[in-house]
């Protein structure tokens, strides 16, 4: 019988907290499941409260554990999202390209982020359900224009067909890693990107 190893190698180098923000029904949970589990469900199930998934990726020789949080976008959950924003390093702002209202809500979500999240948090705008071309009402150029207005990146995705899902999450993680290197004294790093071999509390 072998005894448990006392000095096991670290499973990851850094832990990064990402958030999915947007109106209910835009496909936040579907994007999360596609990225974390490689699965897709066509049934709409409103997220109750808050849930998260984990996926560890490798970037430039470092293992980064992504803790990706998902919550419903309805107004009644806003009290939860105040705590939900705390410690976030990156946020994916999601709208549905077949739903004009969800696109119009993005400005409100950005104001919410500005109120509750860190000033340095990385953001990316996501137009989901790009596979539904016949029902599309929000043109790609409008999404790009809005993203440019706020100085953030933009991608259209399809959780159903796995279009740009990897690119969205990993692209945001790369931006966070770059910011971490460029601003090593950012106090947020000690909260949300914590080397696994230290005993710091994280998020």
UniProtKB/Swiss-Prot annotation:
Binding of GTP, residues: 22-29, 70-74, 128-131
Example GO biological process: exocytosis
Gene Ontology terms, MF aspect: GTP binding; GTPase activity
Residues with lipid group (S-geranylgeranyl cysteine): 202-203
Swiss-Prot/TrEMBL keywords: Cell membrane, GTP-binding, Lipoprotein, Membrane, Nucleotide-binding, Prenylation, Protein transport, Transport
Principal location listed in the UniProt entry: membrane
Cleavable signal peptide: none
Family note: Belongs to the small GTPase superfamily. Rab family.
Protein name: Ras-related protein Rab-8B
The organism of origin for this protein: Dictyostelium discoideum (Social amoeba)
Higher taxonomy: Eukaryota, Amoebozoa, Evosea, Eumycetozoa, Dictyostelia
Gene that encodes it: rab8B
């Amino acid at each position: 019988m072998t005894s448990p190893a006392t000095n096991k190698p670290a499973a990851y180098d850094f832990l990064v907290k990402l958030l999915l923000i947007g109106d209910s029904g835009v496909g936040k949970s579907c994007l999360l499941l596609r990225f974390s589990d490689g699965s897709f469900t066509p049934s709409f199930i409103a997220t109750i409260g808050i849930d998260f998934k984990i996926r560890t990726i490798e970037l430039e020789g470092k293992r980064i554990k992504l803790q990706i949080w998902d919550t419903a976008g309805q107004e009644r959950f806003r009290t939860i999202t105040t705590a939900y924003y705390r410690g976030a390093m990156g946020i994916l702002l999601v709208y549905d390209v077949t739903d004009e209202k969800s696109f119009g809500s993005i400005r409100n979500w950005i104001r919410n982020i500005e109120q509750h999240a860190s000033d340095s948090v990385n953001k990316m705008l996501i137009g989901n359900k790009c596979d539904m071309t016949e029902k599309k009402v929000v043109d790609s150029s409008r999404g790009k224009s809005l993203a440019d207005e706020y100085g953030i990146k933009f991608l259209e995705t399809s959780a159903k067909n796995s279009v740009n899902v990897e690119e969205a999450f990993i692209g945001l993680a790369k931006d966070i890693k770059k910011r971490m290197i460029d601003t090593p004294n950012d106090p947020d790093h000690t909260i949300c990107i914590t080397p696994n071999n230290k005993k710091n509390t994280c998020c």
